[in-house]
Swiss-Prot record:
Residues 603-1033 are cytoplasmic. The keyword Cell membrane applies. The chain crosses the membrane at residues 582-602. Residues 23-581 are extracellular. This is Tyrosine-protein kinase-like otk. GO terms for molecular function: ATP binding; cell adhesion molecule binding; protein heterodimerization activity; protein homodimerization activity; protein kinase activity; signaling receptor activity; transmembrane receptor protein tyrosine kinase activity; Wnt-protein binding. Acts as a calcium-dependent, homophilic cell adhesion molecule that regulates neural recognition during the development of the nervous system. Component of the repulsive Plexin signaling response to regulate motor axon guidance at the embryonic stage. Also component of a receptor complex that is required in the adult visual system to innervate the lamina layer; specific targeting of R1-R6 axons. It comes from Drosophila yakuba (Fruit fly). The keyword Ribosomal protein does not apply. GO terms for biological process: cell adhesion; cell surface receptor protein tyrosine kinase signaling pathway; imaginal disc-derived female genitalia morphogenesis; imaginal disc-derived male genitalia morphogenesis; internal genitalia morphogenesis; negative regulation of canonical Wnt signaling pathway; photoreceptor cell axon guidance; positive regulation of neuron projection development. Belongs to the protein kinase superfamily. Tyr protein kinase family. Insulin receptor subfamily.
Amino acid sequence: MTARMISIYGLVLASMMASVLASSSRFQRLPQSQSVVENESVKFECESTDSYSELHYDWLHNGHRIAYDKRVHQIGSNLHIEAVRRTEDVGSYVCIATNLASGAREASPPAKLSVIYIESASVQLLGSNRNELLLKCHVEGASGDSEPLEIEWYRNSEKLSTWRNVQLDQHRLIVRQPGSDDDGLYRCTASNAAGRVMSKQGYVYQSSVKCLPRLARRKSQKVMESWDKQTFLCRGKRGGAAGLEALPAAPEDLRIVQGPIAQSIIKEGEPTALTCLYELPDELKNQRIQLRWRKDGKLLRQVELGGSAPISGHSFDSGKDALLREDARLVLHKQNGTLSFASIIASDAGQYQCQLQLEAHVPVSSSPGVLEVIEQLKFVPQPTSKNLELDAVVAKVHCKAQGTPTPQVQWVREGENNTLPDQVEVDANGTLIFRNVNSEHRGNYTCLATNTQGQINATVAINVVVTPKFSVPPVGPIETAELGTVVIHCQAIGDPKPTIQWDKDLKYLSENNTDRERFRFLENGTLEIRNVQVEDEGSYGCTIGNSAGLKREDVQLIVKTTGDGFAPEESGGDGFLVTRAVLITMTVALAYIVLVVGLMLWCRYRRQARKARLNDLSTKEAGGDQPDATGNGKGSEQEPCLSKQHNGHSKSRSKSSGDAQKSDDTACSQQSRASKKSAHIYEQLALPRSGLSELIQIGRGEFGDVFVGKLKATLVTSPSDKDADTEKQHSNSENGSGGSGSGSTTLSTLNEKRRSKTSMDDIEEIKEEEQEQHNQSGLEQLVLVKALNKVKDEQACQEFRRQLDLLRAISHKGVVRLFGLCREKDPHYMVLEYTDWGDLKQFLLATAGKVNTATAGSSSPPPLTTSQVLAVAYQIARGMDAIYRARFTHRDLATRNCVISSEFIVKVSYPALCKDKYSREYHKHRNTLLPIRWLAPECIQEDEYTTKSDIFAYGVVVWELFNQATKLPHEELTNEQVVQRSQAGSLEWSVAESTPDSLREILLSCWVANPKERPSFSQLGAALSKAMQSAEK
């Protein structure tokens, strides 16, 4: 390790130590992810519950501290951004609360800001052939997470929908078997909360064969002599077709004298007329001629001027007369060709052109005229009153106005100086937005639309309501005897107060259509039926509702006759049945109490007798002058959570004495000896709480808080001394309890334990390294402290004991040491070894540049090389092999549960910060927080943990190392999807891209479904060693 590397990693240490500091405060209000229209304002709220200390709030944007200005500023603890810009403001925002007294700080979860915008749209051709026309509407814009982008397609001016051969598929338009009816200009529009745009250029589709049909000519008709030799062919040809270019020009004396005015500006609602004066020569009056008006190229109106039969417009308009609809406002005058409008509307705006069409000739067209409409100021649609749900995060009331020029929209509230209340704002589109709806938002709000035409307004009533809920829902099915009484409860809460309506078999019940002597509708909504009849059986529904909505619950009423097993009522009526039920209940309760008291007395007597025998036995074994190690047998009662040995492989080796005792006494005696032995072991681990200092909370685990602190160097014992003392006590305990045990058996057991502790390392090397650290006088040891807060939680206590036994039994430089246990008072403290660089995941994030570690005059540390990653993986494999040889399982192996020192030494640890810091990496499954993305399938399905499941998790750890821990395994899936696919065996794993080729096969074998086919840690260590040698060459 070079001096440069140590200097760089020192900077990483400083940043990581600052990042793990956390105060005891919690956030009362957290920043929420939001989607906002570009150029609108947004506010992120942040507030801590620590009201007793002075707090300072800071905000980070994408991991960098925000530089405030007039547009981005902080008011109190909240962050305000005016005129949001998508190029600068998109990303994640984190609130940092710092306690000025202690310097501890806490970070909120990141809140994401998405910007909604829309710029342009264009039509793209994806494919065109005889069988299918495929177009796509490409949109430059984003809709955030709130509302999807809405796409509409138009053919010429006709809006398209999925019908016949036309199919709309999200952004795509599919026309199957396109024909001449599908010819035209295709355009699309896209809209979202930011606005609406139409494609500037569309796509013109023309079928491959287009010809002009010729009408059969009657014998009585004659063609003019000058055209006798003209021939009209209809021949489809690949690559082109005969069109209007092949038609002859119309006679020169057939012309339009005056067309529409080049530009007309008309107010909406006023009448107007478009002129089309034409000249028709006498020789053509018997010919088939049509006068046509077109709007934006589409045929609008037509009239026959000569001939006895109309001319088909199919030749020139492909049969699409979309604008030839009934409209009484439009009248086409045949005499002078004028197109008159009785009343102009906004949709009449466009380009108009009149034409004279002589059969089989090029049409004669006038100059186009543009009609502009001054749209009247109006609301589209009219704003309406609305009910808002109480405590809704966001509620909107729309107010859209149209007019020429575009009107400005604003909102005011009646009273209170016409100002809007807090948490109510207006966006750029005129939408009234309510945030965190409360009762103060009730009232009348007026929408004002203003332009040069004037001002219009619309007032709406906003009411804050609470959706009706069942406080006492009807519960069934209900069985009752004939002629009995039944009560069906139904009570509701809400604002306004909900009404309650009963029905039977979907027929409403009321006092008017029921027997008032038998049916009673109580004021609280309960239905009471007396003298129940057989015909009363059925399904009863209770419907509650107010202005906020409706809810309904059904219950089935079953009426039993006497023959069905119900006894007829006695003369005493209901009173006799109630009395009999009370007497039976009281008798059963009294018998239960007597039984419980008797069992308590018997257990107390047996416990005292057993303790007396144990005290006598202990006195005899110790020579009569050795006190009980557990304090006269009371240690197990004082420490109920740590009184039993729950290590699955540690079994009592005590043998029964020669005394003839009953089987239950023998079992109780062996259990008591095991408890005394376990308590004696915990006494050896005892540490005074006063030896701990500078405790700083870094998070919360499965059974309590987790701290980082310092332990006095005088309390740190050498691992060799600790092991020798422990083995000596084990030997004495076994020799004392098993009078006939041999010394050779004890010696072989100790040797076996020593071998399990050394694993693949030399025990003398461990002693020399750790003894050197211990002899450095005047230094304090950095430790990790895990508190046992849930003393009464049996599952938490069992896991606490399991981790104690795991770390106590292993002495290996790849696994953190257990320094001791503080049991002087609650909560109990488990004191573990900790390193100066902290947990491995934060180290990987820092080297990947995901954590800002740079200080003044320095840069972020470089990413790890492949050789360094392999070295880390190798050290973890050696530590896990030691755990395997000690016949333990880890169950939560991940980079977050490993620590790394400034000497680049990695150790397997067990912080397990599953409640806050790494809560995203845990999921509650079967009422237990599990790291499901690291667990083997058998752990999730059958709760079966073995060394092979640790192998599975190790493969995920190597995947984390090569990805620098920058992403979660299968982060594209939700936790529920991971559980489902893991149980179904369909969760697919792949190694990281930077993984060496020599490791890919063995790492993939870590994730096979059959645990027996997975490799061992020793095989993984050998493969990693070879890979390290290859990487160094």
